[in-house]
C-alpha cells in the first residue's frame, strides 16, 4: 500500500512495484474453466495507460516494467490450451483526462528527469500524456464523469494521442487475436470528439 500522490513517488513507480510474483495464469484459467466459465476477459490496459502486453507502441508495458511478463500473451496461451475464447478490455482512451489530476505531482516530468533513476530512458509523458492544458474543473477528480464524451470543458486529445491508442489496440488484436474487445467508453473510443478511431478499430477487428 503506497501513497502515489507525491512529486517523487507517482504512478510510474507503482507500475514498477507491481511484480505479479504469485500470478499463475494457466492454473487460474483451468480453475475458471472447471467452474463453468466459457470465455475469459484479460485486462489489456486500464485508465493508467499502461499496456499489459509486449506493446511496441507503449514502452510503459508489463514486459519492460513491473512483472516483466507478457500478461495478455500468457492469458492468451492458457485460454488456447483450454479452448476458452479470449477477450481483452481496453480502458486507455481516457488517460488523457484521468491523469490530469496528476499534473500537481509527477505527471509533468520528462525523459530527462529520469537520469540516474530506475526509469532512466523512459519518458513519463508516454505514460501520463499530460503536456496539455487541463480540462475545466480538472482539480476535482469527480469532474471527469461529466466529461466522459469529451464535452463539458474536457481537454481534447491530440491527433498523436488518438493514433497511438489506435495503433496499440490494433497491434494487440493482430498479436493475440482476441475473440472479443471491450472498450470502457460510452459508444466507441473517443466518441464525442473523433469517431474515426473507434470505427477504424472496429473495421480492422471484424476484417
Over which residues does each language-model region extend?
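Mature catalytic domains of secreted/periplasmic carbohydrate-active enzymes
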Residues: 1-207
Amino acid at each position: 500500500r503506497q501513497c502515489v500522490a507525491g512529486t517523487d513517488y507517482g504512478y510510474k513507480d507503482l507500475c514498477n512495484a507491481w511484480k505479479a510474483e504469485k500470478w499463475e495464469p494457466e492454473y487460474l484459467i483451468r480453475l475458471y474453466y472447471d467452474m463453468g466459465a466459457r470465455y475469459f476477459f484479460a485486462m489489456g490496459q486500464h485508465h493508467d495507460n499502461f499496456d499489459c502486453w509486449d506493446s511496441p507502441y507503449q514502452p510503459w508495458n508489463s514486459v519492460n516494467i513491473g512483472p516483466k511478463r507478457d500478461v495478455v500473451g500468457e492469458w492468451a496461451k492458457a485460454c488456447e490450451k483450454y479452448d476458452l475464447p479470449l477477450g481483452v478490455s481496453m480502458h486507455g482512451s481516457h488517460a488523457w483526462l484521468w491523469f490530469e489530476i496528476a499534473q500537481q505531482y509527477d505527471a509533468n516530468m520528462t525523459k530527462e528527469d529520469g537520469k540516474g533513476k530506475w526509469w532512466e530512458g523512459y519518458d513519463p509523458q508516454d505514460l501520463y500524456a499530460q503536456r496539455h492544458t487541463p480540462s475545466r474543473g480538472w482539480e476535482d477528480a469527480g469532474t471527469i464523469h461529466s466529461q466522459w464524451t469529451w464535452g463539458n470543458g474536457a481537454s481534447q486529445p491530440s491527433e498523436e494521442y488518438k493514433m497511438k491508442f489506435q495503433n496499440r489496440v490494433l497491434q494487440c488484436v493482430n498479436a493475440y487475436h482476441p475473440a472479443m474487445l471491450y472498450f470502457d467508453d460510452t459508444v466507441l473510443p473517443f466518441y464525442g470528439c473523433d469517431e474515426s478511431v473507434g470505427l477504424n478499430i472496429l473495421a480492422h477487428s471484424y476484417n
